Amino acid sequence: MAIINMSDLDLQGKRVLIREDLNVPVSNGVVTSDARLRASLPTIELALAKGAAVMVMSHLGRPTEGEYNSEFSMQPVVDYLAKALSCPVRLATDYLDGVEVAVGEVVVFENVRFNKGEKKNDEALSKKMAALCDVYVMDAFGTAHRAEASTNGVGLYAPIACAGPLLAQELDALGKALDNPARPLVAIVGGSKVSTKLTVLESLSGIVDQLVVGGGIANTFIAAAGHNVGKSLYEADLIDEAKRLVANAQSRGGDIPVPTDVVVAGEFSPTAAATLKAVSDVGDSDMIFDIGPDSAEALAKIIESAGTIVWNGPVGVFEFDQFGEGTKRIAHAIADSKAFSIAGGGDTLAAVDKYGIADKVSYISTGGGAFLEFLEGKELPAVAMLKKRGA
């Protein structure tokens, strides 16, 4: 079941409709973080270089579906692309019944969520979108886990549906990390709650050699090991689940190591005083906000010997510097490792930026929810659609 790649197609004179993930933060009509826009430029430029008439669509924010709201307009994205691309770029507000687009220009459709039926993957809407193009390109990994009209339905009805370079790259990198990884395979999963990442932890505990947990998730594992976690965020109802995951990992010769030392404070604030304690010495009024240096060093050693590293989530409240040393040590260990490394998820990318290691990570995933669902072993709806159309 091969997926068709846009880079292999002849697009000369073709009407090409590209679904990108251009959902960027906007303040006072100006894009404030352009990472996703920069990531999409090579795909748009390739379509132009191949002689296509290019149309681009995306959602932006969470407007009420079916209603225009200037706060969520794509205009700031159009302004950005007009500066970044050496061709005319314009916004199309009413496009579903047809749009004029010339070879060598880019027409950006207004926010797809202004269309009623977008999120429900409405068939009539999908067919209208499909009728606008000769070739549909799905390039938005960040929304590949959602079956919506602009990410899924349109691809079922377009004359040709293919993967854009960004999506293809993403699937290649994730496949390399999970389908046939160089061992040992080490996964680092952070975040505040076990419940939100339970299926990821279950899926990974069955394939990785070492599963490292951090953040609030680690607190539940610390409690499962019989230690006091004081007033820390943890999930008492998932302690048995945590014990089962540890037993599962150990039965395969792996492990989920619990921190031996932690950094605690009496309150959650940027000015809270940090205190280093052995994990067995956590008091009733303590809150755990980071792993200690001994634990960080032990994890760094695990990372140093890895063949493949998957990183999703920090191991402490790194936004506050006094609770950031654990995440910083792990970030630098990943940067120094010779392993194939992949990082994904919003907080993880913020940590990658903060510690300046972007160029030392083998692949940085653009997807949050999609990255997690891939780690869970789920087939993403957009990928299933592309496989179906490539068959």
Curated annotation (Swiss-Prot):
Keywords: ATP-binding, Cytoplasm, Glycolysis, Kinase, Nucleotide-binding, Transferase. GO terms for cellular component: cytosol. It is an enzyme of class 2 (transferase). Disulfide bonds: none annotated. Its EC number is 2.7.2.3. This is Phosphoglycerate kinase. It comes from the Bacteria. Its main location: cytoplasm. Monomer. It catalyses: (2R)-3-phosphoglycerate + ATP = (2R)-3-phospho-glyceroyl phosphate + ADP. One of its GO terms (biological process) is glycolytic process. Pfam families: PGK (PF00162). It is found in: Cytoplasm. The lineage of its organism: Bacteria, Pseudomonadati, Pseudomonadota, Gammaproteobacteria, Alteromonadales. GO terms for molecular function: ADP binding; ATP binding; phosphoglycerate kinase activity. It comes from Shewanella oneidensis (strain ATCC 700550 / JCM 31522 / CIP 106686 / LMG 19005 / NCIMB 14063 / MR-1). The keyword Cell membrane does not apply. Pathway: Carbohydrate degradation; glycolysis; pyruvate from D-glyceraldehyde 3-phosphate: step 2/5. PANTHER family: PHOSPHOGLYCERATE KINASE, PHOSPHOGLYCERATE KINASE 1, CHLOROPLASTIC-RELATED. Belongs to the phosphoglycerate kinase family. Substrate binds at D21, L22, N23, R36, H59, L60, G61, R62, R113, R146. ATP binds at K197, E319, G345, G346, D347, T348.
